[in-house]
Amino acid sequence: MSESDTTDAGDGTALRTPIVAVLGHVDHGKTSLLDEVRGSAVTAGEAGAITQHIGATAVPLDTISELAGQLVSPEDFDLPGLLFIDTPGHHSFSTLRSRGGALADIAILVVDVNDGFQPQSYEALDILKRTQTPFIVAANKIDTVPGWNPNPDEPVQRTLEAQSDRAESRLNEQLYEIIGELSDEGFSADMYWRVQNFRENIGVVPVSAETGEGVPDLLTVLMGLSQRYLKEEMSIDVGGPGVGTVLEVKEERGFGTTLDIVLYDGTIRADDTIVVGGKNETIVTDVRALLQPQPLAEIRTEKQFEQVEAVGAAAGIKIAAPDLDDAMAGAPVRVVRDRPVEEVIAEVEAELADIQVVTEEEGIVVKADTLGSLEAIAAALEEAEIPIVRAEVGDVAPRDIAVASTAEEPKHEAVLAFNVDVLDDAEREAEEKDVKLFADDVIYQLVEEYDDYVTEIEEAQQEQILDKIERPCRFRVLKDHVFRQSNPAVVGVEVLSGTLKRNSRVVKWDGNEPERVGELKSLQDAGDDIDEARTGEQVAASIDGPTVGRQIEEGDELWAEVPEKHAKILEQELADEIPTDELEALRMYLDKQRKRDPFWGK
């Protein structure tokens, strides 16, 4: 185990390196910032001063002190340094999950000062909120402020002193916009040097990944926060059985399927038996090899990895072992060591049960790249009241399409795919079975796209229903506008409320009783045939059945008849979809019917 991974706490336990996740919107500079930290660390120390892990970079305290200059004195810290999770493929922070929340102990949310908060910034905030992970904001790209005078690798205050009033004023405007956006999301925030209590306020650190300005401050704040608020949580049992989380399941030439994991407690050895969360059942297997990247100084050697005998937390490590094909990214990994294997299986299964997504009898199919992502999507769908019938880690396969195609409601014949591929066979089957596929790498956009689709379907369904349903209309026979008395009666009418349509049955109220007087055969306006007439319009109506002067009179108020079943649907399901004048006609029609039968249309 490398010296930099832990520091002795003096009682058999040790303080491990805090795990730092870097997250933010695409192109806001997450990878550049990590590269800058890594590059500066290599320059500041000797070759090998930083340790390159699998999927992570360890920066020891001495190197941080060297980088931060007067800002950090090693004597003030017990923690051994910082371990930056470095997984560009895992741009969803929700990947990094462990017992009870996030795998990362602390996070950096990178926000471009020019763009402010963007979709993935908000998504990251939601996940930070849900997992209660402490974080700071790196306001990146300060070197792009108009008129900026770069001072490579300098702390913020020193570089600000070298700026014109105009450049500093412009930067302040951008920074306060970011602080305002955080406030809108329920976070109290300020420039980090003004924050007294980091538990209650978010510190904003202006940085440039391009020039290194502000990076000393970033490392200082991370070390300070970790030392002050996370020290107790960093206490681990050095020799105890290792506990970690799978970052990625990967094919590796010469080793077969391997696991990239982050170990956050205990130690893993090259001869350990491990238990890993699997897609179908829990996997028990023996470690064949523990692999770390070659040191930076030897990166040109032919071998990409070197084998090690043991690794202690916190570390990123690759495990080669048999039977790992079904392992899941985001799943727990535990070393068995001298405990009964059943006990460890039970622990892993209990942890997986915490992540299980609630599914319903009817709903949509969800596929995601990791367990953490699956959990985050399920939370977003639950909030949007969208039911899930099946939720799994992995690419979209034909069997997922088969499940989606059996949904009772058309809106549930859908698969939501987060950050995974759709297999060719599945795509073909989706077309054949008319299953809608949604793929995105921003959770809220995925949910929004599906929501829009459901709205489209529901609107189309309502239009179909409205087309088939008889709707109420109140109209009056105009005086002195009888063009023909019978067979059929042709009279001038005025529509009082609702829409008058051809082929409607016509009724007239006699006291409390409706009396059917005939059927509306045709409508004309200025000699032209029309299909309907709206409120306020006067048209000629041909009514088959009545004789003017007997069943109907000039000045009579007549109604388009509405069957009881249709009236019920209109009142209970479609009241929001029909125009105000039609709603008025419906209410009057229901009042008349309910005078003789209070339960009519209910």
Swiss-Prot record:
Residues 49-53 are annotated as: G2. It holds the Pfam family IF-2. Residues 15-230 form the tr-type G domain. This is Probable translation initiation factor IF-2. NCBIfam families: aIF-2, PRK04004.1, small_GTP. CDD domains: aeIF5B_II (cd03703), IF2_aeIF5B_IV (cd16266), IF2_eIF5B (cd01887). GTP binds at residues 24-31, 86-90, 140-143. Keywords: GTP-binding, Initiation factor, Nucleotide-binding, Protein biosynthesis. SUPFAM superfamilies: Initiation factor IF2/eIF5b, domain 3, P-loop containing nucleoside triphosphate hydrolases, Translation proteins. Belongs to the TRAFAC class translation factor GTPase superfamily. Classic translation factor GTPase family. IF-2 subfamily. Transmembrane segments: none annotated. One of its GO terms (cellular component) is cytoplasm. Gene3D superfamilies: P-loop containing nucleotide triphosphate hydrolases (3.40.50.300), Translation factors (2.40.30.10), Translation initiation factor IF- 2, domain 3 (3.40.50.10050). Residues 140-143 are annotated as: G4. It comes from Natronomonas pharaonis (strain ATCC 35678 / DSM 2160 / CIP 103997 / JCM 8858 / NBRC 14720 / NCIMB 2260 / Gabara). Residues 86-89 are annotated as: G3. Residues 24-31 are annotated as: G1. Residues 208-210 are annotated as: G5. Function in general translation initiation by promoting the binding of the formylmethionine-tRNA to ribosomes. Seems to function along with eIF-2. GO terms for molecular function: GTP binding; GTPase activity; translation initiation factor activity.
